[in-house]
């Protein structure tokens, strides 16, 4: 392993001395006023016979580039809706290995006889399909004005949320969500809160990667969702603000502000958001305990639980980019997130005999107050050597999480005549800290004959310290509960290196990659525990893995493209899931960690066909070994909810994604995914074999009218599915919105109704360990929301999509408090 790691590191260092042979033609497209023209079509022709070589489009800054162009003489044409076509002078590109930058191509507006009857719009499509990712261009949809990041995600193809706000991509959980290439370090509930406070106006693109390249951390069996925020390079001061008032059963106001200032060589930005969130969660659970024959009912457990949650969250991010030269940038970013959650739970449990006669009643009021304080510091460096694309980047990160949870549980038992039979009171005090240190560097270099090299290394160190102090309260005197009090220490080090090589043939693009990751970790449990936990134990583990990736893209013609990709990935358990503590929900239901969790490994294969940027058809297959997910283990009368390895998961499916402008004012976007999922393995001494064929439908209708009016009708529906031991019933939701631009299109108002028919209520059941259980959920999901968004200062130009963090996989593995309402 050491030799391999040294070899890959040496490759990174040696690459800096390789000569460049990048045949490249670059330039810009602007209008008569010198303003950049985005999404202009630029075509390269051979001068000799006027045959077309290649076509591309300009970015937000009007830039375009043609890579790996053979020596010769060429012509360029540039066009855009609302402009006449312009041609370049002849281009002599006979110097091998040179990069030729042509003078700006200036588009002049044509003469239009009746402008009142004609409106020209040149923009990117809402959804773009690339060989290795799906790109959501947020600004391409006018109805995204006044929306949040979560709103855009929920209508993105293949993205769904479960009852706990866990994000899935194409039916698979454990997706890594990143902001500007940086994992969020947040629990599903905290992440959902943050995404709802992040305005869509601050987002440039959302990238959906089901099979990321070797450049990315190998973690995340279902891939990566990367949210790229806008970053203004225009001199002066500008910003945006977003204010939302949502009303369901409880009010959910939120607000955010994004500020940017550039003067000279320094660029400053400040982003903040606050949401005093309130909500509810109604949970009904019925368990039928069966005899050994698996049919005869022995007893029945019926529980109705109401949870009220108040969860004010605050996030802040400040950064500086200093442009040492036109090629070199230094950056500093500091960010923080504070989440103070308070849950008040009322649980009423009926214990029944097989004939449904009442045996006893247990009433369990409880409170849980949890505070999370997350902070992160990042230093970053970027140097572009030349226009050919040679680049070096580096990141240093430190992240710290502090949490404190105080719990109170009161269990009162009554007879059917409501005579009090007993009472037990338990309190808990659970402090915890997580420290993450990472360093990474990436190097990109175009080579001769159409090759491109990417390579890099990453080091990460993590340590966690979690304690659980529980006390039994008898006659108002607290006694230490030694069977539950515990402390858990965890250490982890991951060393990684990767190399990617890309080759462009005439119609075929090939990218091959290999990532090596060496993982070393240890855990030490002090004190006492139950179930899978020993009284005092420790473990040390180490393993080395190789993660190959391969991408093949073949362009049949201007309208048809074929892609095939393969990748191997890993998912490591969240740090808290390795912690053997018990978290009490009520007298009969616990949550627990599992120090024996093993990482899971996934093989992904995808093949797709894209037609005219309109229809994309994809076939996929994945196989996961040592798959871990939420499991349920019955121990006497107690149901223990913990993450466990359940064996294997297989998934095969076909998806169709299409977008089409039905009229000049109506665009429809359809996504459908039909997939088969099977879970099989040995779990808690019993064979598990469960499967289902599921259909996911997502339809989004966008309307753009005159005078700044717009609208949207969207919805999704998912048929019966499976998730580990649980069979999921069908569910979906329908939403609608209307928008109006005001203040000369610098601001907008949006009125939205979410979950109109209140159908987003996931239900499920499981049949395992001689137990039949049904679970029904209801949350505060039907909402009416009014949003005001305002962009002030100079218009956003020159977006720099580069994120500032190297702490990728490590951040996504932090789980924290959150009710998921």
Task: Label each residue range with its predicted role.
Residues 427-428, 436-440, 481-486, 598, ...:
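Outer membrane beta-barrel strand-and-loop segments of large Gram-negative receptors
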């Amino acid at each position: 392993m050491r030799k391999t790691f040294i070899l890959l590191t040496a490759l990174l260092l040696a690459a800096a001395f390789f000569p460049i042979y990048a045949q490249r033609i670059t330039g810009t497209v602007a209008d008569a006023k010198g303003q950049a023209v985005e999404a202009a079509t630029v075509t390269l022709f051979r001068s000799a016979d006027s045959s077309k070589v290649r076509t591309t489009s300009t970015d937000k800054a009007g830039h375009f580039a043609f890579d790996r162009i053979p020596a010769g003489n060429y012509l360029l044409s540039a066009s855009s809706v609302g402009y006449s076509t312009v041609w370049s002078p002849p281009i002599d590109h006979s110097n091998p290995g040179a990069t030729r930058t042509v003078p700006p191509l200036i588009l002049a507006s044509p003469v239009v006889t009746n402008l009142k009857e004609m409106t020209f719009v040149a923009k990117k499509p809402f959804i773009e399909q690339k060989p290795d990712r799906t790109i959501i261009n947020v600004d391409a949809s006018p109805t995204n004005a006044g929306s949040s990041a979560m709103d855009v995600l929920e209508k993105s193809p293949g993205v769904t949320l479960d009852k706990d706000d866990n994000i899935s991509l194409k039916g698979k959980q454990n997706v890594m969500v990143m902001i500007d290439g940086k994992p969020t370090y947040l629990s599903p509930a905290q992440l959902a809160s943050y995404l709802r406070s992040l305005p869509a106006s601050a987002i440039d693109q959302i990238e959906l990667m089901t099979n990321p390249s070797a450049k990315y951390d190998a973690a995340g069996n279902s891939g990566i969702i990367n949210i790229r925020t806008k970053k203004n390079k225009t001199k002066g001061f500008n910003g945006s603000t977003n204010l939302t008032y949502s009303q369901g059963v409880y009010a959910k106001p939120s607000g955010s502000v994004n500020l940017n200032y550039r003067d000279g060589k320094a660029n400053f930005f400040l982003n903040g958001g606050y949401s005093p969130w309130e909500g509810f969660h109604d949970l009904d659970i019925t368990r039928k305990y069966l005899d050994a024959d698996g049919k005869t009912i022995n007893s029945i457990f019926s529980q109705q639980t109401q949870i009220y949650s108040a969860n004010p969250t605050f996030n802040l991010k400040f950064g500086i980019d200093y442009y040492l030269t036109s090629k070199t940038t230094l950056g500093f970013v500091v960010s923080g997130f504070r989440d103070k959650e308070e849950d008040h739970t009322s649980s009423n449990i009926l214990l029944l005999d097989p004939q449904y006669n009442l045996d006893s009643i247990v009433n369990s009021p409880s409170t849980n107050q949890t505070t999370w304080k997350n902070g992160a510091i990042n230093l970053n460096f970027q140097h572009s050597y030349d226009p050919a694309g040679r680049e070096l980047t580096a990141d240093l990160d430190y992240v710290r999480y502090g949490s404190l949870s105080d719990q109170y549980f009161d269990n009162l038992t009554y007879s059917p005549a409501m005579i009090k039979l007993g009472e037990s009171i338990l309190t808990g005090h659970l402090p915890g800290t997580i420290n993450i240190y990472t360093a990474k560097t990436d190097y990109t270099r175009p080579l001769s004959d159409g090759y491109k090299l990417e390579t890099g290394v990453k080091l990460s160190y993590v340590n966690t310290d979690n304690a659980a102090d529980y006390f039994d309260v008898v006659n108002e005197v607290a006694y230490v509960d030694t069977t539950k009090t515990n402390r858990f220490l965890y250490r982890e080090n991951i060393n990684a290196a990767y190399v990617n090589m890309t080759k462009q043939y005439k119609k075929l693009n090939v990218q091959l990659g290999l990532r090596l990751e060496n993982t070393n970790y240890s855990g030490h449990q002090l004190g006492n525990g139950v179930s899978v936990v020993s009284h005092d134990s420790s473990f040390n583990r180490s393993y080395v893995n190789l993660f190959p990736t391969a991408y093949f893209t073949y362009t049949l013609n201007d309208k048809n493209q074929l892609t095939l990709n393969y990748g191997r990935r890993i998912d490591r358990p969240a740090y808290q899931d390795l912690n053997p503590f018990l978290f009490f929900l009520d007298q009969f239901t616990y949550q627990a960690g599992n120090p024996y969790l093993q990482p899971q490994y996934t093989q992904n294969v995808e093949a797709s066909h894209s037609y005219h940027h309109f229809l994309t058809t994809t076939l996929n297959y994945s196989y996961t070994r040592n798959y871990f997910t939420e499991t349920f283990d019955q121990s006497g009368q107690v149901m223990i909810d913990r993450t466990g390895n359940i064996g294997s998961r297989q998934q095969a499916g076909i998806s169709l994604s299409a977008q089409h402008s039905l009229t000049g004012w109506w665009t429809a976007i359809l996504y459908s995914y039909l997939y088969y999922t099977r879970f099989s393995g040995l779990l808690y001494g019993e064979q598990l074999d469960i499967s289902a064929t599921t259909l996911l439908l997502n339809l989004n209708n966008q309307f753009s009218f005159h005078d700044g009016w717009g609208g949207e009708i969207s919805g999704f529906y998912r048929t019966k599915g499976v998730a580990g031991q649980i069979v999921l019933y069908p569910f979906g939701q329908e939403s609608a919105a209307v928008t109006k631009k005001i203040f000369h299109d610098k601001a907008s108002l949006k009125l939205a109704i979410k979950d109109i028919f209140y159908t987003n209520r996931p239900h499920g059941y499981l049949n395992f360990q001689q137990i039949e259980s049904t679970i029904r959920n209801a949350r505060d999901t039907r909402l009416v929301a009014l949003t005001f968004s305002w962009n002030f200062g100079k218009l956003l130009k020159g977006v720099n999509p580069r994120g500032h963090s190297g702490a990728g996989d490590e951040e996504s593995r932090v789980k924290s408090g959150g009710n998921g309402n």
